[in-house]
Amino acid sequence: APLLESLGGDLTIQDNTRLSSVDLSSLECVDDYTIEGNDMSESDQYDLLVQLTCASEDSLIVFRADDADDFCATGETTVENVYLNVLGTDPIDLSCIETITGYLEIENSLAPSIDLSNVGTIGDELYIHENDDLESIDLYGLAEVGGYIQLSGNSSLVNVYMDSLETADSYFYVQNNDQLEALELSSLLTIGSTFYFYENQNLGEVSAPVLQEIGGSLQFSWHTSGGAESIYMPSLESLSGDLYLYYSYYIEEVDLSSLVEVGGQVYIYQVNYLESLDLSSLEEVGSQLYVYNTSLDSLDLDSLTEVSSSMAVSNNSSLESLSAPLLESLGGDLTIQDNT
């Protein structure tokens, strides 16, 4: 389609094993594209990606390791936007970058590792997605992200180093990362919106030991064949949205021992192997409180004074004791059923 000049939607040219050439010579600046799994040479695909990628003058676009090396050779440490769609299999070293004033996006990259270890701030979003071969991302020095963080569809990703991260001003999503084993967020203090985990089947532990506030919900859902075994957030005090643990069979331990208030519901459903749930500081729940089908032998809600809607504890086959000695106000039904 050499005469095509504009495209109203996304461009996908994917998994065409005999497709060796594409002529879109009149088309420039496509907002969202996926071009992978075809029979194009690396040089032809490089030329096509350069042609189609939208970027401001102060942005860095990396398709090859040489692009990263050339940028670092300039001595620059600040850049507006960084976009990586790496064609080759060499590791990428961008440790020269200290500040990204706009966004960082990494997609469809074949590089096994990317070093951005000295980036301290990202002004907008951090979006790492659909990288089939990427195994490790070093963002060790990253302290602040001004937009959202999303890690999704990275099928080989094992390690993400974000040990210095303190704030994410919007949501933080971690979903469909099949090989991700742990997420250590040892410096994280606040998340502006929802903290969301979905289908990360090898994720053993999520640790955020100094996290104090989540501006939205905390959600773990659909970890049905493994993953999300331990949730360790002992300093979390405020959760504006829901606490939502749903069809995550293999969660065994949840430490939310400082959590005082949940603005929405506490909904724990089909978390079959859950043996330890520490909500010992929880005082108020803004909607319903529901605990269904766990392996808890006790549910101690020793600080709970108010539930704005209903409270139900049911089908917990090992439950021997339920304690809520300070509960004064319950806005709906109280159901304790089939805990046998």
Language-model-derived ranges and their functions:
Residues 22-23, 44, 93, 114-115, ...:
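The leucine-rich repeat
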